[in-house]
Amino acid sequence: MRHCDSFCELIPMKGCEAMLEWMIDQGAGREPADIVLKGGRFLDLITGELVESDIAICEDRIVGTFGTYRGKHEIDVSGRIVVPGFIDTHLHIESSQVTPHEFDRCVLPQGVTTAICDPHEIANVLGAEGIRFFLDSALETVMDIRVQLSSCVPATHMETSGVELLIDDLLPFADHPKVIGLAEFMNFPGVLAKDPECMAKLRAFQGRHIDGHAPLLRGLDLNGYIAAGIRTEHEATNAEEALEKLRKGMYVLVREGSVSKDLKALMPIITERHAQFLALCTDDRNPLDIADQGHLDYLIRTAIAGGVEPLAIYRAASVSAARAFGLFDRGLVAPGQRADLVVVDSLEGCHAEIVLSAGRVVSEALFAARKPVAEVGRNSVKAPRVTASNFRSQSNSGKTRAIGIVPGKIITQNLEFDLKVGPNGVEPDLERDVVKVAVIERHGKNGNIATGFVHGFGLKAGAIASTVSHDSHNICVVGASDEDIATAANRLGEIEGGFVVVRDGKVLAEMPLPIAGLMSTEPYETVREALRKLRHAAEDLGSVLEEPFLQLAFIALPVIPHLKITDRGLVDVDKFEFVGN
């Protein structure tokens, strides 16, 4: 089902003129509106008032407020509050482990009417084909999915990705109606060093929206980064960092995902004064957390429960988000605005009871009417088969670096342990929560295998493995034994990628992700329950992490401080160089 992003788009001029006349007549009350929400109140994000009024809708637009209207179809919203649809300003749909169509069905009923996604997960595996898949899907979804073109594929050259996207690969998509601009520019060292390819991308998108990604970047270096035309940023993990970015003119996107949980730390800056320069995002959130907690509705509830003024958080969730990304047709309950509306039980509860997307009441019938999009990225896992011997350390020294997991953060610690050296090299120390980590190149490029150690998973036995491993999505495995690490890695090749939990050579739980090794072909309900089983299986191995698989997914991302591992080895992100074990 293809619908218009503006009421004139793709409509013959004569039809557009007629629609414009209908909107005027319905807004002026001369004709019954297509839909009228009656009996409730709406939140005016300009004044902060709760206004008792009908809301009249013609086609995909709000045409009337502050009045009484007749409607061809009237919906009683007595005792409830109408707010603008929520906008997720930065996310990777692939991290939900479902296709864009299933993501649409999963989160739109919870009030997320616009999602601004960066498809760089699938782009790292499939390149332009992956971006095209997302753009084709975005034309068919009920919610408005907008796409930022992936700016850093791969994130760095310290890992092996499936492809490399240069500026000439991105430009053919630049004028697509669903494209806003350039996605998170993760290679901030490249920006500051004026790397030629970085400069080519930045120059090509000057005047368009360029999203940022600059964890812990401060001072004059931050100034230089912003001066490149970068407007928004979602990596602030404390109020001090966020305030510096706000003071320097950036929009700060407050993030709360399944692993990166920054909302609590940033609550002090979510005020009515700052709200016009704030927005909300999830970055990476899986269907299990969406089902158990919610999506942006969860962020809103949590913020208000933590003392944030409702007006501030609702502004950040809609109108401020829309303005930050140039979507001036939405974000308010006002005439002329896109009819993206959420009927909630209360501002504090923020439980969506009715959702309208572009003037259509969201229902299973709407989802069923969508045109399907052909699958891509099958059989993308081309890793070599491995044995336990591939993961044995050759070092004679027990003094070893280890990646330190910080629960709820994707930043890691650069730790050092003195470990026992046995007949098969340096051994894990389960008493001190130090186990092995391995990254295996899976794109059929070179068969690289890198091993190291990690602290903080809590594993006492077995292994967990994934092909969701930002950003190049090689196989990443954490385990207490070399044999189980090998079994888990090999199983991922057999199921076209996904998640696996292994103990004593047996698979305890798994979830295939055959679309590029990132997304399931199943409904989100099936994915949700598979994730629940995987999480329980990981807990049975001793995992102490709330979200072990997404935590695992960021171990190999060498643009997030401090110590990471790619298929090429351990990376000291602060120095941006490889280091020995």
From Swiss-Prot:
What are its cofactors?
Answer: Mn(2+)
The UniProt catalytic activity note for this protein reads: adenine + H2O + H(+) = hypoxanthine + NH4(+)
Please name the Pfam families in this protein's record. Adenine_deam_C, Amidohydro_1
Could you mention a single GO BP entry for this protein?
adenine catabolic process
Record InterPro entries = Adenine_deam, Adenine_deam_C, Amidohydro-rel, Metal-dep_hydrolase_composite, Metal_Hydrolase
Task: Tell me a Gene Ontology molecular-function term this record carries.
Answer: adenine deaminase activity
Q: Give the keywords, sorted.
A: Hydrolase, Manganese
Enzyme Commission number? 3.5.4.2
Keyword Protein transport attributed: no
Q: Which residues form the signal peptide?
A: none
Which Gene3D superfamilies is this protein grouped with? Metal-dependent hydrolases, Urease, subunit C, domain 1
NCBIfam families found in the cross-reference section? ade
Q: Please state which protein family the record places this protein in.
A: Belongs to the metallo-dependent hydrolases superfamily. Adenine deaminase family.
Recorded hits in PANTHER family, A to Z, give:
ADENINE DEAMINASE, N-ACETYLGLUCOSAMINE-6-PHOSPHATE DEACETYLASE
Under HAMAP family, the record lists: Adenine_deamin (MF_01518)
The entry's protein name is Adenine deaminase
Q: Which organism is it from?
A: Brucella suis biovar 1 (strain 1330)
